[in-house]
Amino acid sequence: MKAIVCDRYGPPEVLRLEEVERPVPRDNQVLVKVHASSLNAADFEILGGGVSARIAGPFKPRNRIPGSDVAGRVVEVGRSIKRLKEGDAVFGDLFMCGHGAFAEYVAAPEDALMPKPESISFEDAATLPQAAKIALQGVRGKRPLEKGQKVLINGAGGGMGTFAVQIAKYYGAEVTGVDSARKLEMLRSIGADNVIDYQREDCTRSEERYDLILDTVAHRSIFDYRRVMAPDGMFVLVGGSRYAIFQAILLGPLVSIASKKKMGINPWKVNLEEDMRFLLELNEKGKLSPVVDRRISLSEVPQALGDLSNGLVKGKVVITVGHDDDT
């Protein structure tokens, strides 16, 4: 089978498209014929040798084939499999169970996958497992979002951000999206009430006060946002630089203790089926749709991942694997 492989940390150029052996599922795994996958910021962080990646693989990536989001069809099942069967259309997030989605086939644990409804395509399903789920968990957080509350989303034009805008609007919030000028019209089209070009305006110097600030990119100190938080507002970090993440983990709780303002990092909960079912319901109701920047083949992954890391992608990049016997 064809797969994107990575044998060392580095820029996207270290990725190669190679012919490798098709995986054999273990007793608790199924073999999925991949129809679609999608890129996430986490893919680039792992490729670059981030802290979490180095813990798992100090000198090279622990998993040779990257890719977390997957949608496809089960073609083989292990002996312990009880729920899924051959022919089932499935999708899921493989972040915590070996990755491997950037390939024609992947072996995955049964509990990392759930049935794909006929109402959603393989391509659209492949955009949801990581970005939409993290966006949902960030927007809902520890405190329910109320109608009319003001939400600021930094990095609103990316994969996670575009889902967060739509989810916040579903809950009735007034949403302000922050991103580059080339993404602002798209943000308006998916429901953002206000947009800010971060290259022309500093959102932390605004006179607005936000009930929830969701930061998906974290290119600045989390404390810059304190000024624009409502008295009992909440700041949630869901992605970004290592410095900002460590700052949120170590110092955010101190701010939360000293005032009513709450600052911290969203503890990403992987493979929560209830979250995915809720996202599917929103999709079926027409309240949540993936913004797809482009659809690519496996061979185009290195270029697209470079564009993603440079902030050039609007929404999601979908990888179509090219199996022509199914849709």
Kindly give the residue locations of the regions a language model identified.
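N-terminal Rossmann-like NAD(P) cofactor-binding module of classical short-chain dehydrogenase/reductase
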Residues: 91, 213-214
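Glycine-rich beta-strand-centered segment in the early N-terminal region that forms part
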Residues: 21-38, 51-97
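Glycine-rich phosphate-binding loop and adjacent beta-alpha segment
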Residues: 220-287, 321-327
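Short glycine-centered segments of the SAM/dcSAM-binding site in methyltransferase folds
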Residues: 89, 150, 233-234
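Mid-domain Rossmann-like dinucleotide-binding core that forms the NAD(H)/NADP(H) cofactor-binding site
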Residues: 125-197
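C-terminal capping/lid region of NAD(P)-dependent oxidoreductase domains
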Residues: 287-294, 305-327
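A short acidic, Gly/Pro-enriched loop at the edge of an enzyme's catalytic core
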Residues: 204-212
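NAD(P)H dinucleotide-binding glycine-rich loop of Rossmann-like/cofactor-binding domains
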Residues: 60, 68, 76, 83, ...
